[in-house]
Amino acid sequence: MKRREFVKTIGAYGIAGLLPSLTVPYRLLPSLLIPMDDAQSDHLKAYGVAYRAIQAGLKAEWLLNYRGGSFLIPDADALRRDAALNGVRTEPVDEGAVTTIRGEIEASNMDAVPLEKAPKVAVYAPPNAAPWYDAVTMALQYAGISFTKIWDPQVIGGALREYDWLHLHHEDFTGQYSKFFLIYSGMPWLADMVQSNSQMARQLGFQTVPDLKKAVARGIRSYVDNGGFLFAMCTATETIDLALAAHNVDIAATFADGTPIDPDADAKLDWSQAFAFTGGHLEPNPLIASFSDIDGHQVNAGSRRQPLGAFKLFNFSAKIDPVPTMLVQNHRQVIPDFYGLTTSFLRNRLKPGATVLAEEEGAPWVKYIHSDLGKGTWTFFGGHDPEDPQHQIGDPPTDLSLHPHSPGYRLILNNVLFPAAKKRELKT
């Protein structure tokens, strides 16, 4: 197939209609570079263009550490149109320019990683989730990356196996309604949360919401153990580990399950079941919207609350450690911090195998961590919304068209594309 016929085929059928029988060697085709440095006009939508290219069966490459983590895709009319309609800057590059780029990559701390398969994405969220509930949902919608919302019935029913990538956000897997029950009593959104969770627990055969959430946490752990990719932010990071560690312990306040917390709960927690954390101490006060001492910032804990600073992304060896390198691709290395119910993770609460991707220099906490579990991987990112640092309940959802270059949201979208990369054994 000649290039003219290749372009005509894509233009006639659209990106998604491109036939998988295309046999022209990828590297012989003219290419489009999607720069991800300061030349890019919309960093976030650029991820969507790359995602849709591989979703159509086209070969793409992620150029790690090259101009902010750029993408290389085939030069086709449909891809040019997609980029133009979304305000994404592309640069046509001929074979000579590509050869020059590859030479620079080979000689530097860079790498070219093939992106082979668009991951099937699931977002765990209750049906009544508010617009300010989930920064990842907003990022996916803005970038134009397709996803499916799932909740407890799908997890308990085993549907997670249908998805490559799962996101968790503002979910309290201890079943205590984010410990808002007493603080926000009487608020309609809280009443809806309690009613929907209680009804779902009964429907699925659990006596209490905490029992249901523990089972959901175990289902998610099994999903990762069997090869799934998990990305969690905010409350979900801390509470899923608490729920896993408390599989045989009552850690929920009386308002959540009708019984008090086990007074010896701290000593009975089984951290071997957790993803990231160990040795945490619970916050037993039902009036304090904090779960444990895992979170370094304690945003709702009065005198324990810590001010926001900035976190710095680590530099990794792209050729030796491609996975953490992918997760930190950015056009900024230092990023302003942002609160969440869980904002950060105390370093002395991390399991030894956790890789720190970003930290606040000189602070006892870290921001962004990653590791493997079984055949899969997990990544935890503290905080709620990178462009809403204070994040108050009831705030309007962030308008990402006002933040097209958000470095914090780029970290979210790195995680979406990471499962698309051709698997390669980590060398360290």
Describe the residue ranges of each PLM region.
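Alpha-helical scaffolding within the catalytic cores
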Residues: I105-N109, P153-V155, P364-K367
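Extracellular ligand-binding/catalytic regions of CAZymes and related secreted enzymes
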Residues: L29-P35, S41-L72, D250, R349-T355, ...
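Extracellular/periplasmic catalytic domains that process cell-envelope and extracellular macromolecules
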Residues: P114-K117, G158-R161, Y223, D372-G374
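Catalytic beta-strand/loop cores that center a nucleophilic Ser/Cys/Thr
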Residues: D134, Q141, E238, V249, ...
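Structural recognition of the beta-strand scaffold that forms the well-ordered cores
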Residues: V123, H167-L168, L230-A232, W378-G382
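N-terminal export signals
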Residues: E5-P25
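Hydrophobic targeting/anchoring helices
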Residues: Y26-D134, A143, G383
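Helical hinge/lid and interdomain linker segments adjacent to catalytic or ligand-binding clefts
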Residues: L32, D37, S41, F71-R81, ...
